[in-house]
Amino acid sequence: MAIWIEEDAKVLVQGITGKQGMFHADKMVEYGTNIVGGCTPGKGGQTVELQSREFPVWNSMTEAITATDADATVIYVPPPFAAEAIMEAADAFDSVKGEGVIVCITEGIPTLDMVKAVAYVYNR
């Protein structure tokens, strides 16, 4: 099996201000993941508290990656918005760093949305 990121990889959380994003990001910090912040459109400039630490929130992935030099993103957004979040992350990593790892565990993403998102990522 290939190793896609190192143990100290800088990770962003898309949807960090939502219920699932907060829950999972908190557990990730507790278990030692190097969270560097999050992205939620319209909530840039805010911070979230995870494990008694403050993490910044940006409006866009491009802003977040530029500010943090993140290596990966994990996506915790509702199914109707997940494919768009994947494509935004792909664009941002491509334009800022040239590469990055995108993880999305959202259940119930419409099949056609995922087909479009996967094609978008692979055809870059």
Where are these regions (language model features)?
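Rossmann-fold NAD(P)-binding glycine/threonine-rich loop
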Residues: 107-124
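Rossmann-fold NAD(P) dinucleotide-binding segment
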Residues: 66-72, 76, 80-112
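Conserved hydrophobic helix-helix packing surfaces used for dimerization/oligomerization
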Residues: 11-13
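N-terminal Rossmann NAD(P)H-binding glycine-rich loop of SDR-like oxidoreductase domains
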Residues: 17
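Hydrophobic/small residue at the entry helix of a nucleotide-binding pocket
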Residues: 20
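A short, basic/flexible loop-to-alpha-helix module at the beginning of a structural domain
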Residues: 1-8
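NAD(P)-binding Rossmann-fold cofactor-contacting core
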Residues: 27-51
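Short acidic-hydrophobic, aromatic-tinged amphipathic segments that line or gate anion-handling sites
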Residues: 56-61
